[in-house]
Amino acid sequence: MTIQATDDFSYLSRWKQTAAGAGLMAVSGACYGIHETVVHHPNRIPASWDKQWWDGRISWKNKGSSTWGRTIGSFGSDAKHTFGPLHRHTLYAGAVVITVGSRRRWWEYGLDALVSFVSFSAGFHATYSLYFRE
């Protein structure tokens, strides 16, 4: 998908761009829901899942003692250090995708913010409140 600047003021003409950004926001919300479950409610993680990776009370040992493992290399070492950065990166990417490109009226930015909030919230509650419910 190529995003090009345009003078077209039709909000509906940008629906693909808004949908792509909303999708990234939903993924961000889902990642945040998983992250918060892992950090604050590890007892909600299914027993059949690998505790060494999912349970933050023991997964911190996965990082090792090297400087690399304690810094940027910790990404992917456990669920907390995978879904936390994924949440932040997809949140940023969604905001960029939604706002880049054409000039718009002021209320269209507000509508995009609302779509973003609803999408993020839906992703979050799908994981935190529904999938990992007690």
Segments the model singles out, each with a brief description of its role:
Residues M1-D8:
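Cleavable N-terminal export/targeting peptides
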